[in-house]
Amino acid sequence: MNFIAATVELRNHITDSINAYGLDYIGADAAVPSGSSNGEVKLRLLCYDREGAKRDAFTDWKQGTRALITGYVVFSEDTSQPLDLLVTTIEPNIPQDMYCNQVVLGNAFFGSDEIKERKNGTIAIKIGTTLDNSDVTTWLFMELHESRKKKLQDRVRKGRGICIHGYLREYRKEGDTSPYRAIVANDFSTRKERERSNGNGKAQGQARGYAEVDPTPDY
């Protein structure tokens, strides 16, 4: 599960009802603003279609204004499409110069052992994230300040699960259909790995036959 709290700018409401993830939603095109349109994080907001205060606030939200949204980010296989944000709360009464972009990526894993050196004291590594109970995987980068390099070197193992706190970043080159996508991490955590046994793998019990394989019977 990937949690987000962000100030989001509404571009336009989507007129048609959206059926996604087994539920009916009302939707909107939106973005986490940036100084450049090439650097904004594009989103498709999905608000559960049920009468109530949240739905009213969502439908009354004015185009071109910002609201503080919390919810869950869903990454899909098609990286050319905006990220889906399933809205849990919305607060439209905020200062219009307010900025927030905080994400906790809870179902990520290391997609590589290779740590890349970037400009301005930044390092990066490829990570993957999956949909809940699914084989669908999206690839992106985790960017870190170089002061985290020792920790990353100690923890990295391809396929190892990782939980990340940071903010989302996208960049689109002119003509590209898919953006460069990263989570810029404040920090990350991993589960402690068990010590690998140096034993010979043989059973330690007293019964005999664990290391022997009999011929296959013809039943």
Feature locations, PLM:
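Short histidine
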Residues: 27-28, 70
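Acidic, gly/ser/pro-rich intrinsically disordered tails
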Residues: 1-4, 14-24, 31-42, 53-59, ...
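Hydrophobic beta-strand positions in extracellular immunoglobulin-like domains
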Residues: 9-10, 73, 109-110, 168
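Flexible glycine-rich surface loops and low-complexity tracts that mediate binding to linear polymers
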Residues: 64-78, 160-173
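Short, structured interface segments
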Residues: 66-96
